Amino acid sequence: VDSQKVADHNITINEAQQRGIGELVFNMDATQDPSYDNTVYKEVSRTADSVTLEGYDPARQLFISKTYTLHPVKNLEGKVLPGSKYLIRLTVSLLNKSSNVQDLRYMGIFGGSAYPIAKSEPKDTYTHFFYHADGSLEQEVPSYFTGGFFSTAKARVLEGPLQDLTYAGVMSQYYATILLPQNESKGSTVYATRQEFPLAHENNTLVPGVTVAMGIPNLTMAPNEIKTLTYDIYTGPKFNAYLRDLNLTYPAISDIMAYGWL
């Protein structure tokens, strides 16, 4: 934050977004806004490094269990990597309580939002949604949705089907949120949209940002069948040393630094 214009304050990632990182997203489509999980969850267990929530979604007849666990990652010498203090493992278990087979192929995991943390920050330089698929990083800024000389305006996008989708997320100049699916939880789509966010520390000035969700694998569930999805979520600083050290566990995660691209 520009200390000449904005008083010092703590930064909360995704603060101005009403939806939480790791929330379930339904009906992901390029033609309409998705719906979000409104299940009322209850905490059922807690340890020193994890918490488990459970709830029932009557509209979809799904019993849902979500466990958030701190996820320290070690290097080859057994030392915990500093960047892993910003990692959480999310495990989602779904139980189909319907008497019918359910098709959940348009479901996803919400990756939160990113936006400038000061109104003086360049609007289209550092804020991106991004994804890594087929060995390369793709990223777009908020104006991608407003159109220009060579493109038309779009309210939202659903990218895919994508090959080998290893991660997706959002980033601002200093912070990033990255969804990292385990192999069995890899999907092939990424949903993104542009949104205006108020900066509370700057008299609620609106700034443009981006929002992202990652699709789950094509999923059908028989009655009383349980499916489990697992994602590691990095929510922390865009600090090259942290991300570079995590490359061994999460290949190419440091590509979001994109030196020489911006």
What are these regions (language model features)?
Residues 1-259:
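Soluble non-transmembrane domains of integral membrane proteins
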